[in-house]
């Protein structure tokens, strides 16, 4: 409708149309009707093209998430099954696996001449190369670390690039909704992969063994990434304008600014809280309840199912109420979840909860903590709100990812010491306490407005 009104206004301002309207009103009306219809069809065609681009985007990146469920998500089991690593070696292997999260920002900056879709294709290729070597060539221990770094670099570059492409594809005022829709579909892909991995290992279709040169699950990951790469290539071919990288030619290096500090702080807090999701939430099940990986896998499937419904609602909330209220919601919700987890853990360790009761509280705490990860969409929208131009968004998203990883790695030992010497429940109390930062940023946004 907007485009038709714009065309009518343009026609009325032209000398020819005013002449026809005065001298020959009926032909002028016919001409107006024809041009309006033609313009309407053009707008409809453009909208259909954009909708097709969204579908290709969703297929490509959901497939990539699905592939990651067969590869990077179970890499710890690969280390143990194939290389029989001890706890010290496992800790050191976090360096090649997490270092790409820190250096990814510099790689993206160095490839400033590449468009977002080209960067995503490079990322998919890096991931595929890593899965190919690890899954088919049975590398030695040192070479294995190199290709763990390779696949992980691809995985980490994808994160900010994916969000930047999603924001380009979203309609005005619907960015949160589209991000939530993508995250919901991606979570369903992760859930399907988790279920298939569980079945595959339970019935012998998949394995991690030192005496076998082939890793079947990694081979599946390789094939799925190749399919995702195909759909991404089609997206770049059909919508080449989407591959134009937004950056300021006059500025070199990272567009870091003082006004973006609230985003960096919120992202750092997210990195701190991510340790709860990746390390200490599983420890509730594994260490406190002495349950195995199959229990964690089933709980992961339940968490993915819940996330697939929650993530789209978070996106819609952001579009309707804005980033400020989104940060308040994040602060209150995650704070409540961590306090609930602390209460449950205290009950388990003190012996107040036993049997089925302790399992119910532990399982629900684990699921809630996993679902809370989807509030990361609030941080993406915060960066978009603060940015001076679209050129700043992706580079700062990648820098925020680096801040997230640096803090996540540095606090792991501290939180482990708190768990062991102070008490497991205090780890989650700290996670709840830092939620005040989100509330503080929300207050700052209100004053700034």
Indicate residue ranges for each PLM-predicted region:
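Juxtamembrane intracellular "pre-TM" segments in multi-pass secondary transporters
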Residues: 41-51, 235-271
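C-terminal ends and interior cores of transmembrane alpha-helices
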Residues: 125-139, 333-354
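Intracellular juxtamembrane helix-capping segments at the cytosolic ends
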Residues: 157-170, 373-388
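Cytoplasmic membrane-interface "Motif A"-like loop-to-helix N-cap segments
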Residues: 112-124, 320-334
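Multi-pass alpha-helical transporter architecture, strongest
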Residues: 108-110, 135, 224-237, 341-345, ...
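Glycine-rich segments within core transmembrane alpha-helices of 12-TM secondary carriers
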Residues: 180-197, 401-411
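Short amphipathic helix-loop junctions that connect adjacent transmembrane helices
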Residues: 74-88, 279-296
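Helix-to-loop junctions at the C-terminal end of transmembrane segments
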Residues: 104-116, 201, 310-323, 419
């Amino acid at each position: 409708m907007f485009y038709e009104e714009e065309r009518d206004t343009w026609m009325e301002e032209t000398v020819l149309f005013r002449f026809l309207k005065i001298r020959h009103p009926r032909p002028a009306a016919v001409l107006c009707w024809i041009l309006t219809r033609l313009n309407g069809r053009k707008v409809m065609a453009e909208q259909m093209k954009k909708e097709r681009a969204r579908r290709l985007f969703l297929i490509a990146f959901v497939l990539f998430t699905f592939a990651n469920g067969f590869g990077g998500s179970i890499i710890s089991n690969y280390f143990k099954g194939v290389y029989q690593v001890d706890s010290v070696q496992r800790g050191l292997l976090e360096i090649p696996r997490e270092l790409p999260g820190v250096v990814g920002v510099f790689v993206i900056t160095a490839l400033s001449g590449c468009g977002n879709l080209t960067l995503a294709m490079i990322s998919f290729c890096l991931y595929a190369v890593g899965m190919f070597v690890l899954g088919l060539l049975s590398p030695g221990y040192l070479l294995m670390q190199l290709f763990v770094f390779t696949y992980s670099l691809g995985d980490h570059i994808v994160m900010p690039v994916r969000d930047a492409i999603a924001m380009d594809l979203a309609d005005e005022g619907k960015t949160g909704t589209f991000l939530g829709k993508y995250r919901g579909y991606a979570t369903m892909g992760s859930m399907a992969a988790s279920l298939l991995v569980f079945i595959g290992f339970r019935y012998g279709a998949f394995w991690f063994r030192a005496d076998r040169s082939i890793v079947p699950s990694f081979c599946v990951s390789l094939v799925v990434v190749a399919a995702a790469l195909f759909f991404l290539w089609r997206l770049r071919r059909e919508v080449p304008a989407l591959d134009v990288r937004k950056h300021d030619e006059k500025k070199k290096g990272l567009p870091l600014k003082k006004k973006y500090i609230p985003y960096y702080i919120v992202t750092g807090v997210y990195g701190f809280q991510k340790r709860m999701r990746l390390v200490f939430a599983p420890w509730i099940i594994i260490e406190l309840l002495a349950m195995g990986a199959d229990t964690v896998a089933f709980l992961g499937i339940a968490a993915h199912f819940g996330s697939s419904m929650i993530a789209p609602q978070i996106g819609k909330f952001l579009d309707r109420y804005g980033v400020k209220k989104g940060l308040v919601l994040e602060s209150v919700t995650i704070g409540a979840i961590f306090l609930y987890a602390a209460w449950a853990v205290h009950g388990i360790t003190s012996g107040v909860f036993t049997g089925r009761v302790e399992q119910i509280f532990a399982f629900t705490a684990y699921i809630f903590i996993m679902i809370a990860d989807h509030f990361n969409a609030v941080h993406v929208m915060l960066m978009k709100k603060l940015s001076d131009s679209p050129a700043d968004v992706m580079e700062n998203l990648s820098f925020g990812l680096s801040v997230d990883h640096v803090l996540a790695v540095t606090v792991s030992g501290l939180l482990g010491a708190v768990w062991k010497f102070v008490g497991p429940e205090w780890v989650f109390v700290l996670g709840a306490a830092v939620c005040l930062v989100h509330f503080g940023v929300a207050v700052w946004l209100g004053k700034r407005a």
